[in-house]
């Protein structure tokens, strides 16, 4: 297997966190972790035991990371410092620091060997890996879709880029395709491993945005036909060519995943891409989810229309005879989306999310063909089953998901059920879930999203995660408390 190519850490218009000394790790005030109820007792188990088996250096590093992440002012200051370094092309000042702190904590490794070691560690704790090549691409000038989207302008037709820009786009697409193929191949190292893939590097983003605007004109019921709508007279010859190449890249990835029997979870995108992502993913599910759920779509329930879209896709899979694959999340682009598209309150988002989880579980129990022979070992077989992933760092969501499993509302002969968090985040949740299945036959998979690749390519991903979580200070403080207590136990 070919190793990832290491690259230099130049980062433009994207910043990651710089920090301060770790002197406050042990001496700061003690934040108690409550365990005075069934709910709190559930999450008090697992992670404290896990920390006891980690090296002192590993605990110190993680504690240092969370000391920074739990202070919004420090995160913002660090982002500013990174921006200043980038202006003067001084990224080498922060790259080594980031490699041995944030990258080590949040990412699986730069080489296949390092990623496999991470997979081994997780598997030993009863946790499945979801491998993810986490490169995020920024394009300059006329191809900067963020700039175009912020202006609210979609051109009547996307002009054919210069030969130079077309070459850049092809290089980006080919590199992303090659890296995702390696990730899928690497997933075969551990049985049960799954992959997450980001499809947007495969196409000129302006073409994707324009096709998204065309699909958005159709009712939900007819919008999710990616190949059918390529016949639209609104599309130019160049746009159709780009959209067909986009399909070819995605199709080849899914074909390879099917050959390797690796489930793929297609990443969600900003709303100016998302209708197109729904359409292409549904067409891929139609093709590849006949016997086993290989392709999984992502539904962001903080968007008002996502529940209706998910319900429509369920109806289609039942009517057309393919298996549903779904990942349910609240959402990842809250700070960059048009506000009117998002639920007015978090309570409304939570209500939509919880009802969507219950609805798709009930639909799987009713409509999925299933595999009755898998009753004694549900994880061993995915034949005839819907794939459902609940991805959240919300303790209440995870607790209720476990209750659904324990009260038999999840039919494990008809559902491959995944509960997922990001590597390095919400470890108290992940290890509590793993603890709940210790010493028994597991019915569902506990998953960590393992981002991997050269640090220079993964750094923008870390930056986006930092920005997304600036407002989630309570969660960071709660995780910080575990590391403080672990250090106190070892040192005092």
UniProtKB/Swiss-Prot annotation:
InterPro entries: FAD-linked_oxidoreductase-like, Proline_DH_dom, Proline_oxidase
Gene3D superfamilies from the UniProt entry: 3.20.20.220
One record GO biological process: proline catabolic process to glutamate
Enzyme Commission number, as recorded: 1.5.5.2
Keyword flag Oxidoreductase: yes
Catalysed reactions listed for this entry: L-proline + a quinone = (S)-1-pyrroline-5-carboxylate + a quinol + H(+)
Family label: Belongs to the proline oxidase family.
Protein name: Probable proline dehydrogenase, mitochondrial
């Amino acid at each position: 297997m070919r190793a990832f190519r290491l690259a230099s850490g130049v980062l433009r218009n994207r910043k990651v966190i710089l920090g301060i000394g770790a002197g406050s790790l042990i001496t700061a005030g003690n934040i108690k972790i409550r365990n005075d109820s069934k709910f709190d007792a559930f999450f008090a188990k697992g992670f404290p035991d896990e920390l006891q088996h980690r090296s002192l250096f590993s605990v110190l590093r993680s504690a240092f990371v969370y000391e920074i992440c739990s202070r919004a002012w420090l995160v913002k200051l660090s982002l500013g410092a990174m921006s200043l370094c980038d202006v003067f092309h001084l990224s080498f000042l922060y790259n080594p620091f980031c490699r041995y702190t944030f990258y080590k904590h949040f990412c699986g490794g730069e080489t296949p060997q390092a990623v496999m070691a991470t997979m081994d560690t997780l598997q030993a704790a009863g946790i499945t890996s979801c491998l993810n090549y986490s490169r995020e691409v920024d394009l300059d000038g006329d191809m900067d879709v963020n700039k175009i989207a912020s202006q609210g302008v979609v051109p009547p037709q996307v002009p054919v880029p210069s030969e130079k820009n077309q070459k850049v786009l092809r290089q980006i697409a080919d590199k992303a395709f090659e890296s995702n193929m390696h990730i899928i191949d690497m997933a075969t190292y551990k049985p049960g491993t799954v992959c997450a893939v980001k499809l947007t590097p495969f196409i000129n983003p302006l073409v994707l945005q324009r096709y998204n605007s065309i699909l958005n004109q159709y009712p939900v019921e007819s919008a999710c036909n990616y190949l059918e709508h390529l016949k639209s007279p609104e599309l130019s010859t160049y746009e159709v060519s780009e959209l067909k190449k986009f399909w070819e890249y995605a199709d080849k990835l899914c074909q390879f995943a099917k050959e390797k029997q690796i489930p793929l979870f297609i990443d969600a995108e900003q709303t100016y891409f998302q209708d197109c992502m729904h359409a292409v993913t549904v067409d891929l599910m139609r093709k590849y989810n006949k016997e086993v759920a290989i392709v999984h779509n992502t539904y962001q329930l903080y968007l008002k229309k996502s529940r209706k879209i998910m319900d429509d896709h369920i109806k289609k899979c039942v009517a057309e005879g393919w298996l549903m694959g779904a990942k349910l999340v609240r959402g990842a682009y809250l700070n960059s989306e048009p506000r009117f598209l998002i639920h007015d309150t978090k309570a409304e988002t939570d209500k939509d999310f919880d009802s969507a989880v219950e609805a798709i579980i009930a639909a799987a129990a009713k409509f999925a063909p299933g595999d009755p022979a898998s009753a004694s070992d549900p994880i061993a077989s995915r034949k005839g089953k819907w794939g459902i992933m609940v991805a959240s760092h919300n303790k209440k969501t995870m607790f209720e998901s476990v209750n659904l499993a324990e009260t038999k509302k999840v039919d494990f002969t008809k559902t491959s059920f995944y509960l997922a968090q990001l590597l390095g985040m919400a470890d108290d949740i992940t290890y509590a879930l793993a603890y709940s299945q210790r010493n028994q036959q597991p019915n569902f998979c506990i998953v960590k999203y393992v981002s991997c690749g050269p640090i220079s390519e993964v750094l923008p991903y870390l930056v986006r995660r930092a920005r997304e979580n600036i407002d989630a200070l309570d969660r960071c403080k709660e995780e910080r408390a575990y590391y403080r207590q672990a250090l106190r136990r070892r040192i005092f």
